[in-house]
Amino acid sequence: MNVVQQTFAELSIGEPEKRVEGRVYSVSGPVVVGCNMIGCAMYELVKVGSEGLAGEIIKIDKDQATIQVYEDTSGLCVGDTIVRTGLPLCAELGPGLFESIYDGIQRPLREIRESSGGIFIPKGVNIPALDREREYEFVPAVSAGDYVVGGDVFGKVYENSLIETKILVPPKKSGKVAFIACRGNYTLKDVVMELETGKGKEEMFMYHTWPVRIPRPIEEKKNATHPLFTGQRILDSLFPCVQGGTTAIPGAFGCGKTVISQSLSKYSNSDAIVYVGCGERGNEMSEVLMEFPKLTVGGKDDSIMKRTVLVANTSNMPVAAREASIYTGITISEYLRDQGMNVSMMADSTSRWAEALREISGRLAEMPADSGYPAYLGAKLAFFYERAGSVVCLGSPRRTGSVTIVGAVSPPGGDFSDPVTSATLGIVQVFWGLDKKLAQRKHFPSINWNLSYSKYFSNLEPYYEEVDPGFIVNRTKCREILQLDDDLSEIVQLVGKNALSETEKLILDISKLIKEDFLQQNGYSRYDNYCPFTKTRLMLRNIILYFDNSKNAITNYKLSWSTIRKETEDVFYGLMKMKFVMADKEMEPKLNKLKREIEGVFLKMLG
């Protein structure tokens, strides 16, 4: 880390006008080799050609530098100029991020459309990521004479009705406050604070920049103990993730990865969402832009877009920018985390990012590893996922925040032995494996309950004990029933259902009830698109209560399963209808009433 920071500090050495211009030596797709580049640094941002195409130095050899260009390189000639900026690729962080849609290197797409009038991004366009003309009401939080350090909150602005943005001192900056602006309306161009540092006075604005490849510093990482509620019953009950966790969603084409990612964006208990469309179809980002403004948060009239940042790097955009889009997204997420928010970042899909790495690696003639991917694929993925976590933020007042990363993986043909999937599974703690067969049977979410897993149960046990002590037992029994059903399915195919014992017949029918009326969920219906955790645990409680009573009647009272089913037909039908109960104030009384009916039926039947 120290070497990276030192390199970053050294990038600014030398005045821009004194730097020697480089020249284009060769062009191969998005990879450009420049000569006469003595003094340049790794990951320095450069402008290539007369149109000023943005690029980043990824390899240095004597006076030659290899540059990956984030725009279309057609039309570049040998001998064209390369202008060094002396800075790494940075993200602009401040008020105005929400409700925006950016490309992979944080250029605002709406503003580009308005300025150019076309539907494609012009070459060399240079529009700031944050609107410099928009006014915000600034409320100072420090006074002149106070000493501040990196991460301290020195003011706040109300960005919209959902978000209050804290204005932070950039990390690595500190000093005595010489001037602080009074409460009032300011733009991002206005100086709102001046610091007296060892090098003289330094002006502070409401925004600052940060290199996308360097993780933002924190006070300390802490153990994540609060669940990330998704509104999907199978995820919240059987395979939960924590706020600050890492999750992979691998699945073949058409299995529903994007729908799950979008459901998380719409309904999860996160304060902010950063949705990165990396190399996926443009229609998916269009869907998000069309649907999200209509959705509201927590029953209020506020659009869900007010807490969402979109980074769109679709499949028809330059390949090199895919790599940058993931880093841009995680840097924005870390900045929002430093505000004290719980942030969810959706990366859809990391496979396309890995394919971009493979293409660049091939152009550099690096030694390929498995399936042509570079040997450092695992290290790059690990570095990205390690930026997730629940943390104590830098500076004062004390704040805690988290970044949860949900990475969709698109293995070719749904093959989970694909190098990207294998490398991802070695890093993440939660695996939501999508099954093509379930998707073909129209069972959605098509998450395979036998393959998927979560390693966060021990972290979440204290939370579950506090909310519902019986939930852990019910969940374990549910997993056992599904596992036994999987074992019995082969026997049924061989000898038929009649050869099974009464308990085994019960297990088959209850597992069918669990799969069709608990795990299956219609994401496009009003009653089932979102299921709160209270409804999830009460539904599971009622199913397991019915199972336990039925098993007791078979074991101790020697009743047949067909007799029990006939006698309890009404409550069994009630269990099947539970998912149609709307998530309102009548929900708990209705599900508790069904519980009492189940207990009453068995009490009457068994005397």
Swiss-Prot record:
The catalytic activity of this protein is classed by the Enzyme Commission as: 7.1.2.2
Q: Does the keyword Ion transport apply?
A: yes
Per the record, membrane topology reads:
Peripheral membrane protein
Q: What class of enzyme is it?
A: translocase
Gene Ontology molecular function terms on file: ATP binding; ATP hydrolysis activity; proton-transporting ATPase activity, rotational mechanism
Which InterPro entries does the entry link to?
A: ATP-synt_VA_C, ATP-synth_a_Xtn, ATP_synth_asu-like_sf, ATPase_a/bsu_AS, ATPase_F1/V1/A1_a/bsu_N, ATPase_F1/V1/A1_a/bsu_N_sf, ATPase_F1/V1/A1_a/bsu_nucl-bd, ATPase_F1/V1_b/a_C
Any one GO BP annotation for this protein = ATP metabolic process
Q: Which reaction does it catalyse?
A: ATP + H2O + 4 H(+)(in) = ADP + phosphate + 5 H(+)(out)
Q: Which residues form a coiled coil?
A: none
Gene Ontology cellular-component terms listed = vacuolar proton-transporting V-type ATPase, V1 domain
Subunit text:
V-ATPase is a heteromultimeric enzyme composed of a peripheral catalytic V1 complex (components A to H) attached to an integral membrane V0 proton pore complex (components: a, c, c', c'', d, e, f and VOA1).
Q: Hey, which family's this protein in? A: Belongs to the ATPase alpha/beta chains family.
What's the protein called, per UniProt?
Answer: V-type proton ATPase catalytic subunit A
The gene coding this protein: VMA1
